[in-house]
A protein has these predicted regions:
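HhH-family (HhH-GPD) DNA N-glycosylase catalytic core used in base-excision repair
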Residues: 1-187
Length: 187
């Protein structure tokens, strides 16, 4: 079975590619988790974050925004010592700050899911790339999403991270045409 060329032989990576990446996500809390995790990969590989995902979930209350937003500096101090996650103070603080920004959006009547999906007109965008080199690392939509998230107070949401988030959550489907997960290729 052919997969996208970025997938290694790691079973965790294969399962992620086959079952999650590019699948449209419409749960606001899951989208919150993914924007936070995508920010953790800045300067690193996604597999590094993926291998630590369960630890992140444990450390950040299953990404419950209310509980994460209530975390304090003593929590940050504890987490920078936790080898189960990426021990970057700024990235840890970003998750907490992002939870606060997320809650502010929700309190203002804008569900995160509606906000995020508005950047693709609430419709998954399917590329028709035949090779990885044809897949962009950012687009005008990820530029706009990044700018809007930053304006709302989100951190670690540059355009490349936003595009990775859009790919991961199925706002765009960048499986290459020959991949088993490309639309229409799955049995």
């Amino acid at each position: 079975m052919e997969r996208c060329g970025w997938v290694s032989q790691d079973p965790l990576y294969i399962a992620y590619h086959d079952n999650e990446w590019g699948v449209p996500e419409t749960d606001s809390k899951k989208l919150f988790e993914m924007i936070c995790l995508e920010g953790q990969q800045a300067g690193l590989s996604w597999i590094t974050v993926l291998k630590k995902r369960e630890n992140y979930r444990a450390c950040f209350h299953q990404f419950d925004p209310v509980k994460v937003a209530a975390m304090q500096e003593e929590d940050v101090e504890r987490l920078v010592q936790d080898a189960g996650i990426i021990r970057h103070r700024g990235k840890i603080q970003a998750i907490i700050g992002n939870a606060r920004a997320y809650l502010q959006m929700e309190q203002n009547g804008e569900p995160f899911v509606d906000f995020v999906w508005s950047f693709v007109n609430h419709q998954p965008q399917v590329t028709q790339a035949t090779t990885l080199s044809e897949i962009p690392t950012s687009t005008s939509a990820s530029d706009a999403l990044s700018k809007a998230l930053k304006k709302l107070g989100f951190k670690f949401v540059g355009t490349t991270i936003c595009y990775s988030f859009m790919q991961a959550c199925g706002l765009v489907n960048d499986h290459v045409v020959g991949c088993c997960c490309y639309p229409g290729n799955k049995p």
